[in-house]
Each structure stands twice: as C-alpha cells, then as structure tokens.
From Swiss-Prot:
Catalytic activity, EC: 4.2.1.1
Organism: Flaveria pringlei
Pfam annotation, one family: Pro_CA
PANTHER family assigned: BETA CARBONIC ANHYDRASE 2, CHLOROPLASTIC, CARBONIC ANHYDRASE
Swiss-Prot/TrEMBL catalytic activity: hydrogencarbonate + H(+) = CO2 + H2O
Lineage of producing organism: Eukaryota, Viridiplantae, Streptophyta, Embryophyta, Tracheophyta
Protein name per UniProt: Carbonic anhydrase
Length: 329
C-alpha cells in the first residue's frame, strides 16, 4: 500500500492540511509501489536556432527637436552644453521656449548630486565576500574547521534555478547541511545512463557517498519553466535549443493537469502543475536503483514541497512506499 501525506507550513508554525489522495497498487515481490505513476517523454532539440520574434527594431527614436553640436564622446561640460543651446537660439529664434526648458533641465541635472552609482559586478562580489567572511566565516571557526575536514549533509535538495527561490535562503540551510542541485523547474529525470548524467551523478553521489537521509524536490510559485511546459506544443519543431526538451521530463504532470482541469485558467493550471511536476520527479527518483535500496533499508526518505513566494507559504508532503507481499502462482 502506498500513501502520501501533506501538511502546510505558514511560518513560524506548522499546520496540518488535507492529506494527499491515497492510492494503492499491487506489484510483484520486492518491487516498490508508490502513489506516483510517471512516464517520461523527450524530444530531440532541433539544430535550427530560434527565430526572432521580429526582424525590425521594436521602435524608432524620433528625431530630436534640437540637435546641438555634441561631441562624439558625449562628455561635454555644463558650459559647453549651454553654449551650444545659446548658439542654436541665435540661429533659430523660434525655438527659444524649447531651448529655455532644456537649459533649465541641464542646470537642474548639474546641480543635483549623483546618488545612483553604476552597477559594478566585481565590486558586488568583493563586498559580498567581505561581508560573509567578517560576519560568518570569522565568527564561526568551529563550523568551518569541521567543513574543512569534509561534508556530511543530511539533505539532498532539488530546487529551481530561479533567482527568487534559493533554498539555502528560504529554508535557512547552513553550510554543510544540504547538498543542492538546481535546474530549470527543479526537475528530476528518470534513471538513464545515456543522458541527464549530471542529475544522475548528483543523485548517485548524494545517496551512495554522502549518505544523505532525505531527498527533497521543491517547486515554487510563478515558475517560468512550468509555464513553458504548459504552453509549449507537445509535438512539432522546437523554438528553443534546450528548454523545451528539458521541461518535457515532467510532461506527465502537464497531461494530468490538462485532463483534470481542462477549463481552468492557465495561471491556475500552472500552480497545479508546479506541484504535480514535483510528484513526477519523486516518481522518477524511484527509477534509480540506489534510491530504491535506500528506501527499502529505511536509510532514505523522499519528500516534495512547494514554496509560494507571493504569499509567503510553504507546503511539504511525504512519499510513503511499501513492498508487496509474495504471491504464489
């Protein structure tokens, strides 16, 4: 018998929520049975590069009313800009109101302090590391001395590459606590030695070498990868080199949502698919032999989650499994 339970988390307290629908299946002796039934579908990406939406500029800038004789480097001084406008007034007196307004604008810009410095990516990285080192690394020598000897994380986490949903930030993981894999739409493909080796290697390393105790697959609100899955055509040529082929890992989730909620608005379908795709990935994890062994030996557990950064909520559900009884024929 295979069951799954769910509970919602509205920080800071945990609140019981409706359990996920229970289902059962029978299998031969020694075969895992779980509530998630998943298939995989993939399509080879076309070698043709994606075409542009338009082959013309989005807009054309209108010709300026006043075109002073600016220098090419654009580094005119305040005095040079004013002199150019005064010269324009002498030549074209009818432009006096426009020129006067422009002079006022230049004067105001010259007087205002430049409070917004241009973004410096190198400086951002440097300042970020200095802050980390002074506030965390130096103040916690015991932790970092232990990490220098090796890692023994309890969690393996599959999360989306979306910049808004870093699991270490959202779940307050400390260094050494979670082995994290991030990709588009937090997907786990089925076991396959011929492709998706990056994910396969991560699962193998986490389970067999790091001996993680929990594998979490965490989806999130407003996921662009899931919206792509819901809107890309299932068949036909691809418009992307990699994205469409990748998100079809969870095509069974789309099929289920469309079949059960065909008349629902796309945004609501996407929310449903964000969670159902997690279930598909949990099912795909069962195709990895070393994951099944960990489940049989009670050394490993699988859980799914969904982070809603719009409302500040987190849902967590567990995958329970069982071995079927021997059957004589």
């Amino acid at each position: 018998m295979s069951t799954a339970s769910a509970f919602a988390i509205n920080a800071p307290s945990f609140v019981n929520a409706s359990s996920l629908k229970k289902s059962s299946s029978s299998a031969r002796s020694g075969v895992l049975s779980a509530r998630f039934t998943c298939n995989s579908s993939s399509s080879s990406s076309s070698a043709t590069p994606p075409s542009l939406i338009r082959n013309e500029p989005v807009f054309a800038a209108p010709a300026p009313i006043i075109t002073p004789n600016w220098t090419e480097d654009g580094n005119e001084s305040y005095e040079e800009a004013i002199d150019a406008l005064k010269k324009m007034l002498i030549e074209k007196g009818e432009l006096e109101p426009v020129a006067a307004a422009r002079i006022d604008q230049i004067t105001a810009q010259a007087a205002a302090p430049d409070t917004k410095a241009p973004f410096d990516p190198v400086e951002r990285i440097k300042s970020g590391f200095v802050k980390f080192k002074t506030e965390k690394f130096v103040t916690n020598p015991v932790l970092y001395d232990e990490l220098a000897k090796g890692q023994s994380p309890k969690f393996m986490v599959f999360a989306c590459s979306d910049s808004r949903v870093c699991p270490s930030h959202v779940l307050d993981f400390q260094p050494g606590e979670a082995f994290v894999v991030r990709n588009v739409a937090n997907m786990v493909p089925p076991f396959d030695k011929t492709k998706y080796s990056g994910v396969g290697a991560a699962v193998e390393y986490a389970v067999l070498h790091l001996k993680v105790q929990e594998i979490f697959v965490i989806g999130h609100s407003r996921c662009g990868g899931i919206k792509g899955l819901m809107t890309f055509p299932d068949e036909g040529p691809h418009s992307t080199d990699f994205i469409e082929d990748w998100v079809k890992v969870c095509l069974p989730a789309k099929s289920k949502v469309v079949a059960e909620h065909n008349g629902t608005h796309l945004d609501d379908q996407c929310v449903l698919c964000e969670k159902e795709a997690v279930n598909v990935s949990l099912g795909n994890l069962l195709t990895y032999p070393f994951v099944r062994d960990g489940l049989r030996n009670n050394t490993l557990a699988l859980k799914g989650g969904h982070y809603d950064f719009v409302n500040g909520t987190f849902e967590l559900w567990a995958l329970d499994f069982g071995l079927s009884s021997p059957t004589s024929v």
